[in-house]
Amino acid sequence: MQPTDPNKFTEKAWEAIAKTPEIAKQHRQQQIETEHLLSALLEQNGLATSIFNKAGASIPRVNDQVNSFIAQQPKLSNPSESIYLGRSLDKLLDNAEIAKSKYGDDYISIEHLMAAYGQDDRLGKNLYREIGLTENKLAEIIKQIRGTQKVTDQNPEGKYESLEKYGRDLTELAREGKLDPVIGRDEEVRRTIQILSRRTKNNPVLIGEPGVGKTAIAEGLAQRIINHDVPESLRDRKLISLDMGALIAGAKYRGEFEERLKAVLKEVTDSQGQIILFIDEIHTVVGAGATQGAMDAGNLLKPMLARGALRCIGATTLDEYRKYIEKDAALERRFQEVLVDEPNVLDTISILRGLKERYEVHHGVKIADSALVAAAMLSNRYISDRFLPDKAIDLVDEAAAKLKMEITSKPEELDEVDRKILQLEMERLSLQRENDSASKERLEKLEKELADFKEEQSKLNGQWQSEKTVIDQIRTVKETIDQVNLEIQQAQRDYDYNKAAELQYGKLTDLQRQVEALETQLAEQQTSGKSLLREEVLESDIAEIISKWTGIPISKLVESEKEKLLHLEDELHSRVIGQDEAVTAVAEAIQRSRAGLSDPNRPTASFIFLGPTGVGKTELAKALAKNLFDTEEALVRIDMSEYMEKHAVSRLMGAPPGYVGYEEGGQLTEAIRRRPYSVILFDEIEKAHGDVFNVMLQILDDGRLTDAQGHVVDFKNTIIIMTSNLGSQYILDVAGDDSRYEEMRSRVMDVMRENFRPEFLNRVDETIIFHGLQKSELRSIVQIQIQSLATRLEEQKLTLKLTDKALDFLAAVGYDPVYGARPLKRAVQKYLETAIAKGILRGDYKPGETIVVDETDERLSFTSLRGDLVIV
């Protein structure tokens, strides 16, 4: 048969035949024979390779034999362009056509060519005999691969073993111990089994937030199936996870995707209920593969799902379920919902304890139980935009990976010694070129120093290598223990209790003794001298990782917060002068909240600061951010004068759908999503439009706010401060007169009630009145301002000193009871900063000098000192 008509062959078969002339040319041969075709089939890495694999043959070995056979054939010294079809290949193609008729197919496919090789006297017969591939065995393998399929089109190979190509057998992975253990989730697994056991609509869909463990439930079911911990209806079933990406990828022609999916579904239905399909991200089937009139995957699934012919478990997030599945009511009714909630912190700790061994073996480190508890608690507290247990597992994984990296990298002490040796070696080279006695003396000293460092290097290197070796040995033994545990489980499943007992009480016990001995050896090495390597993940490692993720400084997480909170009042007093009552009220409210006595579903604290301008309202908010969250950047400042119009209110939460800027999110909500631990300052709230307070009610009462895109933003870890100038005139009237304080307070509160609704005022924790500043208090504020200026001058290597008279002068000229401390800042700029700036520009002050500022004749005088020497 002359292979001139590609329409008689399948695409893959013709592709291999078309490649044979090229292979013959490469080997300078003029006739195309069966060996060239077999070489082309093996190169495809398709059905031919699969047949050889199932026959138990080694593909590289078969390849070598074919190539060796080709190399032995006669070669032409100068081959002509014309290439002929050899007699053996002609006969092979005739036999392939006979095989095609025998199987009742429409096209010659690769399996027909493989069957024809069994009668090929040139190469095929001998090769098959060598690998033990008889005619019956080949027929069995072809039947196993094809199932009940017939070759009715030119691309049948894409439909063979579809589940193997486009799916992962979870039960097989569970049997091999490649799935992580699933802890808890019994209720959800039980409900899934219950739905799978129904007669019709036996399709559960697992719905939950990303990272709560939906896929883990499917894996847990696979583990239960292999442990026979399921009802009779699910005993010995296969759970196969379908990869929608692989199913769609490479489907070039119209209808090819549908063909692949139909082949998968046919394989599942042909199994008579033996296969359960798991589709992760099930929303991807809606609309998948739909192009101009083509059916999408969801519509292909519907008939089978309804009549119970296909048992399918789906998994998707709440948002995607609503967006894709709920829109298609016909698809939705075929699935039964199983809601997967986020586990609480205690359940997460149990999950982490169950996974601990897996991560220890993988990374070759130990993980302390305190680290697991810290991972669950800190991730729950500090990472609000992700869900447990996923975020806690990620923390443990990353902390263990970091420690593993440190073990394999050179220790810091050794690195320092290496650098020092390199530096001394370079110094020695330059000294060897010198001939004077001082250089020779220095060289002698350097040689001794170098010898000492090299000795230390050798000692440290030896210690590092020995510690590293023991840690590696522990890891290897633990991996073996893991493997033995798998073998024990397999033996128990096979009811081979003799083997299980032999492994458990023989091999496993020996390995556990080995681990104990190695751990003791490592402990001795580490206690005998200074340990170079650490092989246990601790609480501090978890805190360090979370600090990198969230930007909250590590000391904030590890340092005893009690200590910090006890000293909060003193810290605030040192920065905010003359507002003792306000500082005490703020500190006490935060202490109550952090001690766990305030409502956990509301913000940490909320205050209204009332008082005239320049008395320290905003300064106290900044000081609070700095002391609680270690940076003033944790202060989210929103100027309410920007929200005077009704339409501007939407800027807080983001523009509604359909408006410009919808994708950008809100100014307030985005800031808190990025940094959930913040002090929020709403400056001058009396200027805001009334609708702003409707938004505030929700934040103050529930500690949450939903932005325009539907994200719920958590305000439970924020401190909310609102400032206002309302009633300032009454506060200034009684400045310094404590006897009239209550009268003033009631008048100020009357003004507040006139301007704000009672439901708003009622939700605020405390309304704090800031007093007008007294002249005596301004001196302390001057010192704070001077300290700030002195710090800036230090960068230019200048020191600043002010006499008491100079301080009193600045306090006097900067005092204005109406404007508070702001005129003081202007006075420091006018009388002090300007004069020093001019002096620096004129060159009066040189680096290293001290600028002494005094007051003479109601003006400041400046003197420059170098040491005790006065420079005029």
UniProtKB/Swiss-Prot annotation:
Belongs to the ClpA/ClpB family. It comes from Synechocystis sp. (strain ATCC 27184 / PCC 6803 / Kazusa). This is Chaperone protein ClpB 2. PANTHER family: ATP-DEPENDENT CLP PROTEASE, HEAT SHOCK PROTEIN 104. One of its GO terms (molecular function) is ATP hydrolysis activity. Residues 561-772 are annotated as: NBD2. Residues 6-148 form the Clp R domain. Residues 9-73 are annotated as: Repeat 1. GO terms for cellular component: cytoplasm. Transmembrane segments: none annotated.
